[in-house]
Amino acid sequence: MIAGVMEPPLTDPEEWAEIINGAFAKLIEPVYRYEGTLARLMGDAILAFFGAPIGHEDDPQRAVRAGLEIVRDIAPYREEVRERWGIDIEVRVGINSGLVVVGEVGSDLRVEYTALGDAINLAARMESTAQPGTVQISSDTHRLVEPLFDFEDLGLTEVKGKSQPVRT
């Protein structure tokens, strides 16, 4: 899962740091509630994954529920940011399911526990092509959670790094 906040243009860096820190709290809390793992903060986005180090049979469902809660729960904070700074922030979430390698990567100076693989890359592409205020999932995730949620088929989406369009 990738969840990102779209930065408005011409935002003061100090104000943006305060805004994004508040937003991160809203992005991270549902991940932990559904027992996901926060892998990293990436500027204005988070990378989280479900299924490691603790796996659940319903990890794809947990990821989707966390994504939906992120979009829902950011709304009051968006209003607060609009009132305080006059800035509209938007959140979008991308989710994909697939095989990844999970473990510690880095060097003697810095190590992080993360997930690597094409499934993570596709989640990032889902986030980058999602409409603001939405959760966009891949067809792989859709197959795993289809009877549990209502979906809108967005058709085929061109994504960076893929030779063929991806169904979203």
Across the structure, where does each feature detected by a protein language model lie?
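A short glycine-enriched loop-to-beta-strand structural element that forms part of the catalytic core
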Residues: 44, 48-49, 87-103
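Conserved, well-folded catalytic cores of nucleic-acid-processing
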Residues: 56, 70-73, 77-80, 84, ...
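Cytosolic regulatory/linker segments at or just downstream of nucleotide-handling modules
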Residues: 100-102, 123, 129-168
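Catalytic NTP-binding/metal-coordinating core of nucleotidyl cyclase/transferase enzymes
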Residues: 1-69, 73, 113
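Regulatory/sensor and coupling segments of signal-transduction and defense proteins
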Residues: 1-4, 104, 162
